[in-house]
């Protein structure tokens, strides 16, 4: 059979698995132009020609939008809306059967000219949509399930643009009564080409509808059609939205149970409401909001009693008895899979997607199986019901369909194309025209969206009774009452308020020997003595020797400040709290006899009773925070130079000192030079010993130096440390310490005023320093003249020489001058040359009459001292980087102090 022919202006819409559209206006116009040219031309008065032969009749296209009716589907009225994406709406009346048989089946046609021609209102238009996942043709507005496995378009409710006689007569909102219609069933004959039809007998219009014919592909289950694109034969049971049964259609019509089923299902759908301008859930998956708050179910999983209110499930919890998958769906399926099918609870949360058909059957592995097939109910975002596709290879075809949808963007295997037994286009058409294309929530509501308290044993906790019996009154009375009255104000009614005040003051005074004196203890004792204030006073005064076990309210109770603290412990606590900044673990370490809890408790008492000390702690914390901030800034800007190095650098002019000044001579242990070249006068004071071997001039010089020795130290407290910092900074303890004395101040202003007194002392010290420098210069001149005599006469003729280097504390052996160069070793010759060179340089310097500073004089004196030492030991030590050590001779000490 050749494929149906289309007019030249007919364009089949493009369809794929991702975008499926219904018949548009062009499809509907082409449909009417092809099948009803007289009606489309507006000739309502002309008669439709008689039924044509099967070879001359043009069959309507599959996707043209023509309503497909079953062989037992009558029609009542005709209404066509060109602005809707839907075919003409055909409303079926309730079925009424009769036994009247008539063999006249010649005029098997629909007389549309006998129907009233209602003009379409032009003042109402629906804006066309450009793209839609599923048009309104598949929405619940136009598809109303009246009978099982049957597709019938549905009209709108209370549509003001539709005549009243086009509304369903069974609708609840319809108020107009229609005339009673009588239907007469005319039995079918046994011939294949003698179809069964129904005739309507009415006082008004007469309609004859052909239901079953050899050329009707939608009414004949055994007839196969040709695909539009491929030309392959397509089974009509795949294309028709009506589920084809293998039984005789006449038996289904004659069955009275069919009417009861239709009526019961019709009542279940009466509660559904729709609007003509709002797409339903079928039209778009994301068109409506979530329905989880008001789920629907089947009578199998409704646990509520009829007549009671629906249970409420508060968000975000989902209703446990809802349809569809959820949080606990896998748990329920795994639990049900471990049990036989007969033992599974019917009240368990359902994971099914079809509530009308009662699809609650589960396999042993926990998966849901369909009623008519075991194919999937959803694939690649679309809902395909296996019960509509009564085939065994439906899953394979659906998988092939999914692979085909990706063929445009990826290289799919061509072998999948050859394995298909049915056309992909036919499957898409069947899915579009199928009534179960999208999942619909069926059945009554099982959850109430309005919040309320759920009543009933199913929603309340089941608490097991105590020992499975009730507690008797005697047993309740036998239970000991653990509540104990500690204090009651009734005992104060018979006591004078002045006595109570005096008693409280006594408890807080030092007359109470027990630690933790407070009013709470006094009131407890008054309660224990039952309001006898005299007995309470006696107990309070002997609280240190009282047996507290007889007082249940006082025994074992920890009162505030009940730990005794001695004054020494309080001082230790203050020092520890100042240093640790409220680190009570460290405070407890400083106080061995106290725990951390006791230290914390005493801290709040000390804070309240000693506000001045607490204010000091608060200032310390604030100053430490500022100090930390300043230290971080200084470290980020430049590295901090240690104060010790600064004092050493600024103590003297290292550029004017020679290498001999920094050398150490390893001889006797008492002549070593140490790190501290300049120490306080308390550590380097001259010893009160007679100096042996000194000349009278040397003794006088020592006496002058002793008398004019500076009293204030200058090397120990150097102003370099204060000059290195910008502004005074608090110490670690939070105080501002004076760098010249041991005084400390809380404020910077106090420290600045104190430093002014040090400045006055510094000026006086500078004047004394200048006077000491003059005296030291005179002493150095005398010393230089004495050394010059030694240089001028280097060879002494006798060890009893009057000078004999006695002022240096060294005796040069006289044998050196009597030795000849041949008798000296090479080492001695080298030493003699070096010493002679140094002595010549010293003599040249002293020959000049230029005045020398005390520091230069001390340098020359030190060199002479080293040369004399080398002559005595007959050894030469290399110059090292070790600084000079304080010598023991008082003259050198005087020179060092004069330099400072």
UniProtKB/Swiss-Prot annotation:
Tissue localization of expression: Ubiquitously expressed.
Chief site of localization: nucleus
Domain annotation ELM2: ranges: 451-544
Cross-referenced InterPro entries: ELM2_dom (IPR000949), Homeodomain-like_sf (IPR009057), SANT/Myb (IPR001005), SANT_dom (IPR017884), Trans_reg/Corepressor (IPR051066), Znf_C2H2_type (IPR013087)
Biased composition, class Basic and acidic residues, residue ranges: 358-377, 412-425
GO cellular component: histone deacetylase complex; nucleus; transcription regulator complex
Zn-finger region bounds: C2H2-type: 736-758
Gene3D superfamilies named among the record's database cross-references: Homeodomain-like
Signal peptide: none
Biased composition range(s): Polar residues: 53-75
Subunit structure and binding partners: May be a component of a histone deacetylase complex containing saeg-2, saeg-1 and hda-2. May interact with egl-4.
Function: As a likely component of a histone deacetylase complex, together with saeg-2 and hda-2, functions downstream of the cAMP-dependent kinase egl-4 to regulate the expression of genes required for egg-laying and foraging.
Name of this chain's protein: Suppressor of activated egl-4 protein 1
């Amino acid at each position: 059979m050749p494929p149906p022919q289309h007019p030249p202006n007919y364009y089949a819409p493009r369809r794929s698995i991702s975008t499926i559209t219904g018949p548009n206006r062009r499809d509907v116009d082409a449909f009417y132009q092809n099948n009803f040219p007289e009606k489309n031309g507006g000739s309502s008065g002309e008669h439709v020609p008689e039924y044509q032969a099967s070879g001359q009749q043009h069959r309507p296209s599959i996707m043209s939008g023509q309503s497909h009716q079953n062989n037992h589907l009558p029609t009542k009225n005709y209404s066509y809306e060109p602005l809707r994406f839907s075919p003409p709406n055909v409303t079926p009346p309730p079925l009424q059967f009769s036994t009247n048989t008539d063999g006249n089946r010649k005029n098997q046609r629909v007389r549309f000219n006998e129907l009233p021609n209602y003009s379409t209102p032009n003042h109402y238009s629906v804006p066309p949509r450009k793209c839609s996942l599923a048009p309104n043709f598949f929405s619940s507005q136009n598809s109303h399930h009246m009978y099982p496995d049957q597709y019938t378009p549905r009209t709108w409710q209370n549509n003001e643009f539709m005549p009243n006689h086009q509304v369903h007569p069974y609708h609840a909102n319809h108020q107009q009564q229609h005339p009673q219609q009588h239907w007469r069933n005319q039995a079918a004959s046994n011939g294949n080409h003698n179809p069964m039809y129904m005739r309507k007998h009415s006082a008004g219009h007469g309609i004859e509808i052909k239901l079953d014919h050899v050329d009707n592909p939608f009414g004949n289950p055994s007839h196969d059609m040709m695909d539009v694109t491929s030309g392959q034969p397509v089974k009509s049971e795949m294309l028709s939205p009506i589920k084809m049964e293998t039984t005789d259609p006449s038996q289904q019509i004659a069955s009275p149970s069919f009417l009861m089923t239709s009526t019961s299902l019709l009542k279940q759908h009466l509660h559904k409401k729709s609007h003509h301008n709002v797409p339903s859930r079928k039209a778009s998956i994301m068109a409506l909001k979530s329905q989880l708050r008001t789920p629907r179910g089947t009578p199998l999983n409704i646990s509520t009693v009829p007549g009671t209110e629906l249970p409420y499930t508060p968000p975000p919890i989902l209703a446990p008895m809802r349809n569809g998958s959820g949080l606990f769906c896998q748990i329920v399926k795994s639990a049900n899979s471990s049990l036989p099918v007969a033992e599974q609870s019917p009240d368990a949360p359902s994971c099914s997607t079809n509530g009308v058909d009662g699809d609650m059957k589960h396999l042993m592995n926990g998966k849901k199986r369909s009623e008519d097939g075991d194919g999937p109910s959803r694939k690649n975002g679309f809902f395909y019901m296996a019960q509509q596709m009564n085939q065994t290879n439906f899953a394979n075809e659906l998988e092939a369909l999914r692979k085909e949808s990706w063929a445009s963007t990826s290289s799919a295997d061509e072998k999948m194309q050859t394995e298909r037994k049915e056309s992909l286009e036919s499957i898409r058409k069947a899915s579009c025209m199928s009534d179960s294309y999208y999942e619909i929530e069926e059945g009554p509501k099982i959850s109430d969206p309005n919040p309320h308290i759920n009543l009933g044993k199913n929603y309340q906790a089941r608490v097991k009774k105590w020992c499975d019996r009730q507690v008797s009154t005697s047993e309740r009375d036998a239970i000991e009452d653990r509540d104990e009255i500690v204090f009651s104000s009734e005992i104060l009614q018979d006591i004078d308020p002045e006595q109570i005040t005096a008693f409280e003051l006594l408890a807080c005074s030092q007359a109470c020997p027990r630690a933790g004196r407070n009013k709470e203890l006094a009131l407890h004792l008054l309660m224990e003595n039952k309001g006898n204030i005299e007995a309470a006073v006696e107990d309070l005064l002997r609280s240190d020797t009282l047996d507290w076990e007889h007082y249940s309210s006082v025994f074992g109770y920890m009162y505030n400040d009940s730990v005794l603290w001695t004054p020494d412990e309080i001082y230790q606590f203050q020092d520890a709290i100042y240093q640790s900044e409220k680190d009570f673990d460290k405070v407890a370490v400083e106080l061995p006899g106290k725990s951390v809890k006791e230290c914390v408790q005493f801290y709040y008492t000390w804070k309240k009773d000693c506000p001045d000390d607490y204010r000091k702690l608060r200032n310390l914390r604030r100053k430490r925070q500022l100090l930390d901030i300043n230290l971080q800034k200084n470290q980020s800007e430049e590295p901090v130079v240690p104060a010790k190095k600064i004092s050493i650098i600024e103590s003297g002019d290292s550029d004017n000192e020679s290498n001999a000044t920094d050398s150490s001579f390893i001889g006797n242990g008492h002549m070593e030079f140490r790190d501290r070249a300049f120490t306080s006068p308390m550590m380097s004071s001259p010893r009160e010993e007679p100096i042996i071997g000194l000349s009278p001039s040397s003794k006088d010089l020592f006496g002058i130096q002793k008398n004019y020795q500076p009293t204030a130290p200058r090397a120990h407290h150097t102003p370099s440390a204060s000059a290195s910092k910008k502004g005074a900074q608090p110490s670690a303890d939070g105080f501002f310490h004076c760098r010249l004395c041991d005084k400390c101040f809380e404020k910077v202003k106090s420290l600045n005023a104190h430093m002014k007194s040090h400045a006055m002392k510094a000026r006086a010290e500078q004047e004394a320093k200048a006077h000491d420098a003059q005296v030291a210069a005179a002493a150095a001149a005398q010393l230089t003249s004495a050394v010059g005599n030694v240089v001028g006469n280097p060879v002494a003729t006798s060890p009893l020489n009057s000078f004999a280097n006695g002022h240096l504390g060294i005796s040069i052996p006289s044998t050196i001058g009597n030795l000849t160069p041949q008798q000296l070793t090479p080492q001695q010759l080298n030493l003699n040359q070096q010493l002679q060179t140094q002595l010549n340089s010293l003599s040249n310097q002293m020959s000049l009459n230029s005045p020398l500073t005390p520091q230069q004089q001390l340098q020359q004196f030190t060199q002479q001292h080293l040369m004399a030492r080398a002559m005595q030991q007959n050894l030469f030590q290399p110059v090292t980087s070790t600084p000079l050590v304080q010598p023991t001779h008082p003259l050198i000490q005087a020179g060092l102090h004069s330099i400072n």
